[in-house]
């Protein structure tokens, strides 16, 4: 099995009046071809861990490796490019650009690594049509339902064919039927060369993952594989 993402002795603390340790000496290997669910109460460190794995934030202690290459968190330019090419991110809340259409939100993600606007637009159109939004291409986020916004978010996350998809409560703000549709769309993105990790409070969706991880007190343990 190819352990593509390795976390080694990760700790993360935030300095306020009192040092708050969110993650504590956490180590775990994630394999390509699998979907992992992160469960745990609010404040257990799920979002913090996803931010570290997406290179949005850096650990206080420890290292992160992608395909055995250690991340240098001082090289922001390299990390930004790696994220754009290799990591797709889906958030719980609508994170779309409000002044851009659904189509523009998706193809702009492709333009971050390819300056061919026409090719990016064509690719985005094909992708949005494939996920059932052919009649919403020129709609702005405010004109879309919550489920439609999440479909656009997933399209934006996968347009560059990333090796990793990270999703933070992607169904959390949706009604159950819409949540099931969005989860199925996310699940459909699995392939042998891709790793998917999502955080959730919903055991129904967590149980559908290949591996369920429980986060408590800044650490993680495997519930099932």
Where do the language-model regions lie?
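The feature captures the beta-strand-to-loop junction immediately N-terminal to the Walker
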Residues: 39-41
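Helix-to-loop junction immediately C-terminal to a conserved catalytic motif
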Residues: 54
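Conserved ABC transporter NBD signature motif
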Residues: 62-73
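Short coil-to-helix segment of the ABC ATPase nucleotide-binding domain corresponding to the Q-loop/switch region
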Residues: 100-109
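Conserved ABC ATPase signature
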Residues: 140-150
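A short, proline-enriched helix->beta-strand linker immediately N-terminal to the Walker B motif
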Residues: 159-163
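Catalytic Walker B motif of ABC-type/P-loop ATPase nucleotide-binding domains
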Residues: 165-168
């Amino acid at each position: 099995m190819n352990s593509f993402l390795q976390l080694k002795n990760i700790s993360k603390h935030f300095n306020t009046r009192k040092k708050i340790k969110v993650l504590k000496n956490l180590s775990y290997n994630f394999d390509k071809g699998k979907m992992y669910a992160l469960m745990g109460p609010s404040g257990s460190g799920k979002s913090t861990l996803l931010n570290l794995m997406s290179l949005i934030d850096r650990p206080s202690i420890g290292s992160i490796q992608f395909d055995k290459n250690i991340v240098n968190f001082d090289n922001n330019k390299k990390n930004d490019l790696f994220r754009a090419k290799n990591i797709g991110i889906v958030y719980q809340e609508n994170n779309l650009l409000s002044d851009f259409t659904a189509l523009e939100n998706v193809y702009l993600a492709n333009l971050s690594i390819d300056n061919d606007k026409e090719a990016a637009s064509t690719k985005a159109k094909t992708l949005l049509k494939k996920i059932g939004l052919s009649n919403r291409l020129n709609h702005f986020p405010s004109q879309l339902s919550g489920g439609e916004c999440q479909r656009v978010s997933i399209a934006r996350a996968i347009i560059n064919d990333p090796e990793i998809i990270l999703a933070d409560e992607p169904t959390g703000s949706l009604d159950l039927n819409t949540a099931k549709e969005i989860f199925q769309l996310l699940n459909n993105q699995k392939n042998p060369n891709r790793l998917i990790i999502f955080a959730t409070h919903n055991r129904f969706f967590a149980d559908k993952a290949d591996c369920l991880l429980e986060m408590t007190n800044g650490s993680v343990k495997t519930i099932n594989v």
